[in-house]
Regions:
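N-terminal cap/leader regions of alpha/beta-hydrolase-fold enzymes
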Residues: 1-128
């Protein structure tokens, strides 16, 4: 299994993205979009599980526009915590059109990777 964190070019800058994939390839790409609490170890574990069954998984930090300090601690899941308040302040500034542009950047990136095989993609983003 290969794991790496890369910056993917978007219209608004460089989007930090966790990538997990088996060796060799090509493999179908999965865009694993974070939920409201953002990137955390549980989501990386989901990416790893998908990678072990033959997918090239991209897990982008969709909060990258607010800076690199948008990876929150475990208390982000606790109502009333300072981390949750920080996350909500960033999340409240998000809108769909920029995220769709981020997806376009991810598609362009995936299209350039020899380890990625073209195929359908699915998207989900929940809220906290």
């Amino acid at each position: 299994m290969i794991e790496q964190t890369l910056d993917i070019a978007t219209g608004d800058g460089e989007m930090e993205t966790f990538i997990c994939r088996p060796e060799r390839g090509p493999f179908p790409a999965v865009f694993l979009l974070m939920d409201a609490p953002g990137i955390r170890e549980e989501l990386k574990d989901m990416a790893r599980r998908l990678g072990t069954v033959g997918y090239y998984v991209l897990l982008p930090n969709l909060y990258y526009r607010a800076g690199r300090d948008t990876i929150y601690g475990p208390s982000v899941l606790e109502e009333g915590s300072a981390e949750r308040g920080r996350m909500r302040a960033v999340r409240s500034k998000m809108s769909i059109p920029p995220v769709m542009n981020d997806i376009a950047g991810m598609l362009a990136f995936a299209d350039r990777q020899k380890e990625v095989r073209r195929g359908p993609a699915g998207f989900v983003m929940a809220t906290a």
